[in-house]
């Protein structure tokens, strides 16, 4: 079984191919991604390029398992991109820090739409069936993050473009680091 591909592996920037038919190989790749995501402690989503597969699908953890989204498309966005916030149990607000399994211990502030509409396909009885949904909050943020992977866009690209903050977070220690230091590893 494959593992999660780490930055700066070039497969993370590759243009993916749509899934045209559900054959044994594709079903095996989908199942493999699903297992890797289920077994990951910190992952909320995982895209095919992150396991070295050049196909258009990703998985999102939900209550009761992993939903696999095939050939996803972003249909509409609502409002403006913003830096999402979190509120803890005491009502204290802080920046929502986005992470990625391909960037262990790195987290950053990423501008995202808080409401989106999307469509995709799911495998049912060996065939692809269409789905669509309007999503808000964390679900919308997660969907955009995984969808970006299919376009070769990484969360650090948004941080660089929008001037967000990037942190190295190991255990209890969190320190701000330079986005340029991370991106220069790609060269």
Regions found by a protein language model. Name each.
Residues 1-187:
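Positively charged
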């Amino acid at each position: 079984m494959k593992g999660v591909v780490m930055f700066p592996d070039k497969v993370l920037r590759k243009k993916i191919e749509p899934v045209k038919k559900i054959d044994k190989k594709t079903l095996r790749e989908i199942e493999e991604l699903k297992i890797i995501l289920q077994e990951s402690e910190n992952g909320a989503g995982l895209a095919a390029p992150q396991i070295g597969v050049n196909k258009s699908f990703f998985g999102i953890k939900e209550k009761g398992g992993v939903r696999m989204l095939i050939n996803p498309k972003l249909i509409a966005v609502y409002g403006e991109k913003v830096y999402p916030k979190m509120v803890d149990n005491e009502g204290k607000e802080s920046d929502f820090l986005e992470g990625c399994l391909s960037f262990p211990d790195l987290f950053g502030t990423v501008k995202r739409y808080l409401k989106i509409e999307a469509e995709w396909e799911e495998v049912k009885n060996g065939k692809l069936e269409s789905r669509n949904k309007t999503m808000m909050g964390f679900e919308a943020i997660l969907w955009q993050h995984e969808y970006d992977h299919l376009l070769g866009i990484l969360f650090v690209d948004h941080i660089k473009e929008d001037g967000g903050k990037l942190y190295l977070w190991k255990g209890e220690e969190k320190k701000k680091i330079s986005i340029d230091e991370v991106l220069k590893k790609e060269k």
